[in-house]
Amino acid sequence: MTAEVFDPRALRDAFGAFATGVTVVTASDAAGKPIGFTANSFTSVSLDPPLLLVCLAKSSRNYESMTSAGRFAINVLSETQKDVSNTFARPVEDRFAAVDWRLGRDGCPIFSDVAAWFECSMQDIIEAGDHVIIIGRVTAFENSGLNGLGYARGGYFTPRLAGKAVSAAVEGEIRLGAVLEQQGAVFLAGNETLSLPNCTVEGGDPARTLAAYLEQLTGLNVTIGFLYSVYEDKSDGRQNIVYHALASDGAPRQGRFLRPAELAAAKFSSSATADIINRFVLESSIGNFGIYFGDETGGTVHPIANKDAHS
């Protein structure tokens, strides 16, 4: 899309292709009442001095309180805290009633069981269109070692879910595959008969194994997103774990990217591949993804929790 005036929803969906973590930004207002909102626009800025930033919509109900606060905290949610993320993304009257929290050294709300937290003094507030960029100087932090909660394309993903999928498939040979997307087009290997890129698990982290394989295959930078399909192919006894992944711009070394209109006429190597591609095209068109569990002929699609990870 190259028009001077973009469709806001389409632009937001494109921004959502970038996989991020999820945070809840907290502070205390002038009356000492805790305030907070969910945000995935969190970035580390500098080690010396220790700086980070987060973006806040000017339309947020927390805008006045947050921008006038002298201090704030970033709570990096762990993979078990989807409910916390959803609570602080919605206009709930008492968001803090549903979470275990305490005041930090500088008076900011700190959540229990987060992957990490940072308490900050307000360094700067920068105007940026319909948002402001809040830059904080880290005054205290803690890293729990827990896995963080991931977010991409309107859905959550977690390392634990991937681990469970691999554990469930330990009795057979495990094939890792990917629906590798580049600006709406899907990468496929082969010439006349097309297949999803795939490799065999050799131990360790399946997402890292798959990312390394895809980058070697395509010569592009690859970000592994959410789990997309877990199924057994009874014809060969193999367990298949398929992720959604994103590729950087550029032409691949091997294979090709096909857009949805081209996929409709494509010939696939198996009915399972065709089913995955057809489901992805449909789910992409409505922006609502799920995870398939079953075999190559039938199973169940479990919806990925949807939310707006914004203030």
From Swiss-Prot:
Pfam families: Flavin_Reduct. Its EC number is 1.5.1.-. GO terms for molecular function: FMN binding; riboflavin reductase (NADPH) activity. SUPFAM superfamilies: FMN-binding split barrel (SSF50475). FMN binds at residues 38-41, 55-61, 88-89, 95. InterPro entries: Flavin_Rdtase-like_dom (IPR002563), NADH-dep_flavin_reductase (IPR050268), Split_barrel_FMN-bd (IPR012349). It comes from the Bacteria. Keywords: Flavoprotein, FMN, Nucleotide-binding, Oxidoreductase, Plasmid. Belongs to the non-flavoprotein flavin reductase family. This is Probable flavin reductase. It comes from Rhizobium meliloti (strain 1021).
